[in-house]
Amino acid sequence: MALYCVGDIQGCDDAFERLLATIGFSPSRDTLYVLGDLVNRGPHSAAVLRRCITLGDSVRPLLGNHDLHLLAAAYGTRRPSRRDTLQDILLAPDRDEMLEWLRHQPLARRVHHGGGDLLMVHAGVLPQWTAEETLAYAGEVEAVLQSREFAGFLQQMYGNSPDLWSPELQGTDRLRVIVNALTRMRFCSPEGRMDFESTESASEAPPGLVPWFDAPGRRTLNTLIAFGHWSTLGWLDRADVLGLDTGCVWGGCLSAVRFGTTLADRERCHVECPQAQMPGA
């Protein structure tokens, strides 16, 4: 039995299929965690969702910002942008099945493997949060997304404020901070104030900002965190963090990591990808 994590697929189903073949993925034996952004910008978003649904419990995704955007567009709370490639889902005869499946996926996961814990999110974890708090706060959003009030939440989800976590936050403000941290954050201030403008690589941090994983005093420092979202960062393999978004949709590659008997025993697997989207297009 093998354990894998894969970065942002973003509708690139051909690359996803080739990656599964490259690693010899067996749904009866292996488990694959997808770190969010299954859809959008690539040409075959519906095929990615159908493949994941067909593979059953062997594929365990997280929600990313593009997945949440799909839900908002599908339920009429957000207009699709000209760069979106979601019509194959929105017009599909099995649209409702795909959307319902997606709506019931989590924003964070944790798995115990080889004597250690692996925490998985799409974008980042605020430095103030422990691993347990991250899962609990993600669960607050998941409960709303999976309730009858989900459409109202999707309508209020967007926005950059508040940009700083406080345990006293309530209602929409609280849920928005949680969503933004888990699905949008790249940089933050040393105090944990989130920035949503900068998309540079970690080595080009704007003044006063640091990559979220380098924030001083980060409370998840002793937990391995796997994440995607940050294509300009590319492949990152450190003792404490694994960055797996290697820009598949931009003509980079689709990357996965295979864990051996322990979390420290790991190797990268990847397939090259044709460019499906032009930056700024």
Curated annotation (Swiss-Prot):
Hydrolyzes diadenosine 5',5'''-P1,P4-tetraphosphate to yield ADP. It comes from Acidovorax ebreus (strain TPSY). It is an enzyme of class 3 (hydrolase). Keywords: Hydrolase. PANTHER family: CYTOCHROME C5, PTHR40942. It comes from the Bacteria. InterPro entries: ApaH (IPR004617), Calcineurin-like_PHP_ApaH (IPR004843), Metallo-depent_PP-like (IPR029052). Belongs to the Ap4A hydrolase family. One of its GO terms (molecular function) is bis(5'-nucleosyl)-tetraphosphatase (symmetrical) activity. NCBIfam families: apaH, PRK00166.1. SUPFAM superfamilies: Metallo-dependent phosphatases (SSF56300). It catalyses: P(1),P(4)-bis(5'-adenosyl) tetraphosphate + H2O = 2 ADP + 2 H(+). This is Bis(5'-nucleosyl)-tetraphosphatase, symmetrical. CDD domains: MPP_ApaH. Its EC number is 3.6.1.41.
